[in-house]
């Protein structure tokens, strides 16, 4: 975010944030993609 070099406890927080965001965003995007596909594949 901002220029704050006095934060030595930022590495695990950023890693955990990255894991949490991607761990939730990837299945969510896949789920929305499946729902959108189902909307278009109505027989």
From Swiss-Prot:
Any one Gene Ontology molecular-function term assigned to this protein's record: electron transfer activity
Any one GO CC term of the record: chloroplast thylakoid membrane
Cofactor(s) required, per the database record: heme b
Pfam family, one: Cytochrom_B559
Entry keyword set: Chloroplast, Electron transport, Heme, Iron, Membrane, Metal-binding, Photosynthesis, Photosystem II, Plastid, Thylakoid, Transmembrane, Transmembrane helix, Transport
Binding site for heme: 22
Membrane topology of this protein: Single-pass membrane protein
Transmembrane segments: 18-34
Cofactor descriptive note: With its partner (PsbE) binds heme. PSII binds additional chlorophylls, carotenoids and specific lipids.
Annotated compartments: Plastid, Chloroplast thylakoid membrane
Record keyword Nucleotide-binding present: no
GO BP: any one term: photosynthetic electron transport chain
Chief place where the protein resides: plastid
Similarity section: Belongs to the PsbE/PsbF family.
Functional summary from the UniProt entry: This b-type cytochrome is tightly associated with the reaction center of photosystem II (PSII). PSII is a light-driven water:plastoquinone oxidoreductase that uses light energy to abstract electrons from H(2)O, generating O(2) and a proton gradient subsequently used for ATP formation. It consists of a core antenna complex that captures photons, and an electron transfer chain that converts photonic excitation into a charge separation.
Subunit and interaction comment: Heterodimer of an alpha subunit and a beta subunit. PSII is composed of 1 copy each of membrane proteins PsbA, PsbB, PsbC, PsbD, PsbE, PsbF, PsbH, PsbI, PsbJ, PsbK, PsbL, PsbM, PsbT, PsbY, PsbZ, Psb30/Ycf12, at least 3 peripheral proteins of the oxygen-evolving complex and a large number of cofactors. It forms dimeric complexes.
Protein name per its UniProtKB record: Cytochrome b559 subunit beta
Species this protein is from: Cyanidium caldarium
């Amino acid at each position: 975010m901002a220029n704050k070099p006095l934060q030595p406890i930022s590495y695990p927080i950023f890693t955990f944030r990255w894991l949490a965001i991607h761990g939730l965003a990837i299945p969510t995007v896949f789920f929305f993609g499946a729902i959108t596909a189902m909307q278009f594949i109505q027989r």
